[in-house]
Amino acid sequence: MEYVTGVSKKETVEISEILSGDFEGKQVKVNGAVHTIRDMGEVAFVILRKREGLLQCVFEEGKTKFDLKELKEASTIEVEGTVRAEHRAPNGFEVRLDTIRVLSEPAEQLPFAISKWKLPTTLETNLDHRAIVLRNVRERAKFRIQEGVVRGFRDFLYSEGFTEIHTPKIGAKSAEGGANLFRLEYFHRPAVLQQSPQFYKQMMVGVFDRVFETAPVFRAEKHNTKRHLNEYTSLDFEMGYIDGFEDIMAMETGFLQYTMKLLERDYAKELKMLGVTLPNVEQIPAVRFDEAKQKVAEKYHRQIRNPYDLEPEEEALIGQYYKEECGADFVFVTHYPSKKRPFYAMDDPTDPTYTLSFDLLYHGLEITTGGQRIHDYQMLLDKIEKRGMTTEGMEQYLAVFKYGMPPHGGLGIGLERLTMKLVGEDNVRETTLFPRDLSRLEP
């Protein structure tokens, strides 16, 4: 009988091990994909692409046991050779090849050269060939940084006593309501794809006090803009026993501070590759919704057209205002009108036309919505009745409050929007692995 005893050490080495200098002058075995081949005659540079980056391998006619003409870009190979320090090589080390063994070959030539620094293709072409485009090191770097954001979110919240949860994405009713729902038949019963894990987050506050989730959400909005997707990844948390909605803003600020340090430490290569300057998150200004509108109207001579919500242009100008006034990259806009917030949002007791809620703007783009929730059962019922809503389909949710809930609140962060602003892109599809929008269901 054979037994599996865990992960065994491989014969092959990784780029990080080579760059440590410990293997200089030693024989190594490395595998990877052929990113590009630069044939100089008797010498050729075979650039291997691995998860950690690129590695320069040197093919020498008469010394390397392989016919270079047989090697194709995008082949996966295993090579053996000697590690040498070389200041002209990327990262200062290269492998002088003795042998090359082909593991697999492409059936066709790549549709375009992915080894170029910036691909000479349109966004639509990039999305049509998404899996190939993502092999480009610059494209790949965006999603390494996105990984860092999610790592930061998880690690920081774990350190603050949060429990990670996983909630259903198919339900009978959506927390946000409205008409922007993807509807489907669920074994002969009507169902919807969830716009938010809001109901479940609140339910679980009664169980774990502090919870978070990173998961997809679905919005059937017929927008065709650079900032909207119909499926995106939401970084959500909900926390109980708060003193006010300011606790939620403080927790998000802490997450951003932790994450920027993490990116600086563990993703310096990707940040440098993309020319990213990390934002200032030492302190984030907060301004009331109505005051923000007034400030922008006065400074930029703009008429207030919609008193109940922020238009995209207003968000951009608020970001510009606080960048000019105090060098801020982020700004919290607080106390949104009750009319524009969901029924579960806590109204401001000093003025119920406003809520104890907020959005976080990053360079003038909304990336977060959050606030304090109603935790009193009767208050929830009164708000539902006042809005002319029905409790049908919400019985399980309301039962949580019937049997006691602490003061609580939370937020949702759009991962793709946050990444877009971090890496300096202007279209959210650029920072989505496989975007879903009005026209795209593939790949």
Which functions belong to the PLM regions below?
Residues 206, 210-213, 229, 233-244, ...:
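TRNA-recognition modules of translation machinery and tRNA-sensing kinases, especially anticodon-binding
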Residues 240-248, 253, 293:
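Extended, domain-scale alpha-helical bundle/helix-rich regions
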Residues 176, 254-360, 386-399, 403-404:
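Metal-assisted phosphate- and nucleotidyl-transfer catalytic regions
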Residues 146-147, 312, 374:
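Short alpha-helix boundary/capping motifs
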Residues 2-240:
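Class II aminoacyl-tRNA synthetase-like tRNA-binding/catalytic domains
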Residues 141-145, 276-281, 368:
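Extended, non-catalytic structural segments that build the interaction scaffolds
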Residues 148, 152-160, 196-206, 210, ...:
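Generic, well-ordered alpha-helical scaffold segments in large soluble proteins
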Residues 91, 160-163, 246-250, 392:
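Short, solvent-exposed positions on alpha-helices
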